[in-house]
Amino acid sequence: MCDQGELCVGGSVCDETQRKCVCAAGHRVRRDTCVLNGNSSSAIGEECAGSAGSKCEGGAECREQRCACPPGETNENGYCTKLERSRFSTYRPPTPAAFADRCPLPEQPTRCQLPDCFCSRNGREPPPGIPLEKLPQIVVLTFDDPVNDKSMRDYRHLFQDFRLVNPNGCPMKATFFVSHEWTNYDAVQWIAEQGHELASNSISHRVLSGANWTEWLAEMDGQRQIMAKFANVNEAEIVGMRAPQLGLGGDVQFLMARSSGFLYDNTISADPGIDGAPYWPHTLDFAVPYRCENDYCPRVSIPGMWALPMNVFHGTTEFLRSPMLQGMLVGNETADHVLYFLFRNFNRAYTQNRAPYILNLNAEFLQSHGGVGMRALENFLGLMTQYPDVYFLTMRELVEWMRAPQSVDQLAQKGRCPQFTYAAPSAAPTCRQPNKCMYQTPGLGSKEHQFLTCNRCPMTYPWTNNPMGATF
């Protein structure tokens, strides 16, 4: 009952007429949470039936009629993980005493060597060992913000209807920086099952500049936990992050990322100029090699942490520039105009130093002004398939390429596709009819939140400091 103003739990909301907690249409209460009729998935430790993993949540598998984590993984809050969260949940690094040194190359080559360290004095030099003409031009498609019905129409179109492959026959994959609020986790699970990369974009999507260590950890690692729990994805494979709204957090952000199991960050904006050669990824062992126009850029040495800079896009003049493609639209563009600046910025890398061309996309860019962004992107992708030396990789694959660079010829001869599958091998396929979880959230700006998941609904709406949606 909710006749005295009580908040409902378990994915239900208060029916103001009946004054009682109700689930979404077609749902019933099972073990105190709302479950879609016909959905019989089981949590870790519960009984299961059918082939291994077919009825289990959270990356578990069905063994001896009971859901259990695979060997080498442990149950953490209802999902299986290889991460030892106790290592970093309360860890606080000492305050470094000095700024990072300038890159010591080429005079002292032993101080920074691949695979764990890479730098150059001007930030524009590619990894050594491959002639420029043999370097592949790597292109990365990244998508920002929530994953829901609004954005999934475009994602399914791009990766189901508009099938494109790399020169070696491998399908093009993308990286999705997912934020929590308004995200549906059955859709996130579908993205992972298609072989795309998932990365963290925070829970609340609020700017975290000036936030402390605990706040950064709660937002970025918390979102990683939410995706593992409610999208049945392998938490250990979520190794990338991008700060919400590109709000840098200084040394705290990057120290937290490195110590809590993140491999790379894609937040720092770098402006090479309208015709300048763009900047290459680098580790933070040494000082950032480009001008940092933000007070919250990293200043100290963070060995092994990869920074993948967002090279600023330029329009036809110096005055139109942005790290996100949405910022390049002013309202009167045609698809041909957008294609022009996509191709112009691509050539800035392709004709000079082959630095990775990272496209920072979101649903707003694809759908604005009658969909000019989507039409331009389709045309751009079609043009890219005509280049024998252009390869589309995920961010994770880009870092792996940086750690062990390969020439165009080597990529073309690979016996397997350079892609990653982020769904746990024992996870069930994305369900056709997910559970709809509804919550009253008077303290979050919107009085009600809801999301879809193939798993059972949590007791309360997942949020910072409570990513599992538990009751206390």
Predicted regions and their residues:
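Short, charged, surface-exposed secondary-structure boundary motifs
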Residues: 208-211, 274-282
